Regions:
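Amphipathic, low-proline, heptad-repeat alpha-helices and/or compositionally biased low-complexity charged/polar-rich
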Residues: 26, 188-190
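Extracellular/lumenal glycan-associated surfaces
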Residues: 12, 30, 173-185
């Protein structure tokens, strides 16, 4: 024995065939933008009832996708707030009371300040792969979230979350696709159960 400790490989216990490379540890902020939201003045009617989707945490429940918000803002409301336009494929992540509720945007929209949304960098992070890590992100958010009034996780705190990641988009997409099919199957069976009773 040469006295050197054998280097441990960074690979998951279960893996899809055809993937052999070690996984790597990456900070979320290296592979995605973390984007907060904002609220136009509620005292100005010209900011509201427009065409721009504007999500609040109460709208995020057990659904996987969101495509239309309860409240909408106008272009003027958007321009006069700190809300940011989020592209389709963004994972909305609630950052205040009820940390870690998530949904995937199917069309562009924005949020109030109760979110730190995850906008994957193209070619570096698969939307459904990161969505499948929701429970891990939620645990971290609750652990580090701090506030005198209520628990909250900041964009800076989200950006430094370290995740073990497949080194290739192909493996991320394979994992994401697997969980997407599984979620779709669960949703289908839940609907069938509703019709039975």
């Amino acid at each position: 024995m040469n006295g050197k400790k054998k280097e441990e490989r960074r690979v998951p216990k279960l893996r899809f065939p055809g993937f052999t490379e070690d996984w790597e540890q990456r900070k979320l902020g290296e592979i995605a933008d973390i984007v907060g939201g904002g609220t136009p003045s509620t005292g100005n009617p010209s900011y509201w009832n427009g065409e721009i989707d504007w999500y609040a945490p109460a709208e995020i429940a057990d659904q996987i996708y969101v495509n239309s918000s309860q409240k909408k803002i106008t272009d003027l409301g958007y321009e006069n707030s700190s809300a940011k336009m989020l592209p389709p494929g963004t994972v909305l992540f609630t950052s205040r009371a009820g940390i870690g509720k998530t949904a995937i945007l199917t069309r562009k929209g924005c949020t109030n300040q109760g979110f730190q949304s995850i906008v994957p960098h193209r070619g570096e992070l698969d939307t459904y792969f990161i969505f499948s890590r929701t429970e891990e992100l939620k645990r971290y958010g609750k652990l580090v979230g701090a506030g005198s009034t209520f628990v909250e996780v900041s964009g800076k705190q989200m950006a430094v979350i370290e995740l073990m990641m497949p080194p290739t988009m192909r493996e991320q997409q394979t994992i994401g696709c697997f969980f997407q099919r599984l979620d779709n199957l669960i949703t289908l069976h839940q609907r069938k159960c509703l019709y039975m009773f």
